[in-house]
């Protein structure tokens, strides 16, 4: 009996255990769901080492769609908690989400490889290798700024579809995956849904279209009501004088928007009358008296247009040489990481937002964190150069127009910029601008061109071999290739005798290239006289500048059927100012100052270059009147401040690397100058000379400078002193002092007179002067 009772109790215990297990099974699913949701939250917010590790693993798998993994985990957890069974991964919603995710990964990877191909960074055809390089080699899984595509899963999908149906087919496959995912996610077939919804959509469109047409068609009665309403609105209201007095007595000023709006209305109301008055006055002023023809005031350099003249083509210049900068692309990501780590090691939190690869330097745009002083970033220049192993860096803090700091790092290989590619660029290149000159390309690679008549004068300075003469040649070539000889004339002064002589004979010259420094001051004075003569013309014709005068000449020619020449622009080019300042500093400085102050309206522009940017060459008066500056590499920050009124030029690389500070700009722009070879210059010059010979203006050619010895009244002891010096064959001031018992000033004056007349030679330090005259010549 006892055994039978034990057998009966055993099944009862098993049933109780099974009952407890069946009650606990839903709780396990609840616990599993809660744990999965917790893991997903840790992944999303990257809590601790586990969160960051899971997030990095998610980026490795899914790339830029790494957030989808924790959300898929949350969806799976909810299915566990609701369905209370394993196998939820086969659920229709989960499968639909996976299809949609796969399409997004494929789209992202197609875009990633298009970007890599356009950036010329793609080194192989293997999608898996290139993705591994982006994710692991370049530390992409820890960098949240760059694009990662679809991760390794996206790389597998892209590699599979690319090998089967190419890149375009991979995009089509992505669309198909997206449609399949939407169908599975919604649980509705696509075609029946479209068949059901299309008529409803078409009816809505028809109703809206009919309502719009009905609203646009108005009855005659409605039109009359609208016209009456508009008349009542436009009818002026009577002015209440009491309100005006109250406004006048009110001392509180009106708010700024009201004042602005009120002023704009007044200007709009009174502007037509003022414009008509100005036009009538201008017509009265510009109308010449028939008794005073235009030819009473001839313009130097004016000539009739040679209609057969053809501008030189850009094909005469060498085509740009393609440069390989693939090595620089590999360094960009690594240098960006080094910059962020270097700043972080000094307690400065920053982020690299943008990188510009230029011809000579790479510019990294740094966005500092809130509360970081710009001065702290600038003070770390040497540490940044050490971290990047760079020869020298330049920091632009801040970048004008941006809330970022620019760090310019020299490239390992400098890409040459040709003048042809700059002149052929479509950026800032109006065809009607005759004085548009090409300078080069900036850090972002954009062609930099500027109009000389807007500068209006430019000072170019830099050390020897930094690229000044090439820049001057590029400016001259730009003008020759855009302007005909009757439109622009030039006066060239080249004391070095080798830089500008190649342009001798071109029809744009007013006079042959001036190479004698003593004639240069005279040439500048001739240009000043031409400027004064032009202002007399402006006064006579009632115009204010060269553009107004040329418009007046065209109107005069049309009205009187005459052909008076237009007034040409004049560009004065001085290749070495230091030599001129040594020979005739006062005359040169006065002429340059007058031209810089007044010549802009007369159409005369200065281009002055020097390799000695010191204060005795670039004086304060010259700097004050020449607003635009171009600085090449200099030896010290003092020279940079002399040119730009600020440091920066001492960190340039040379070979055309320049800082361009146009008039009105707050900070200079870094440019890699355009290179033009001697062969290109000769080709263009020969092409121009073959079409038209130079017609020099006699009034602008400097005359021979005669060196006349000063024949002032000689000292009464002069003849005796000469006789003594010739007899003794030696001469000195102290000897004349002792022999004739005179003071030092009188003795020195006698010796100077002897030197001026060729009796004695120049001083040789502490030695006596050498006597040039012999006794036989003296007796003759």
Swiss-Prot record:
Intracellular or extracellular location(s): Cell membrane
Gene label: ftsK
Organism: Sporosarcina ureae
Domain of life: Bacteria
Function comment: Essential cell division protein that coordinates cell division and chromosome segregation. The N-terminus is involved in assembly of the cell-division machinery. The C-terminus functions as a DNA motor that moves dsDNA in an ATP-dependent manner towards the dif recombination site, which is located within the replication terminus region. Required for activation of the Xer recombinase, allowing activation of chromosome unlinking by recombination. Also involved in chromosome segregation into the prespore compartment during sporulation.
GO cellular component: plasma membrane
CDD domains attached to this UniProt entry: TrwB_TraG_TraD_VirD4
Name of the protein: DNA translocase FtsK
Biased segments, Basic and acidic residues type: 212-229, 275-294
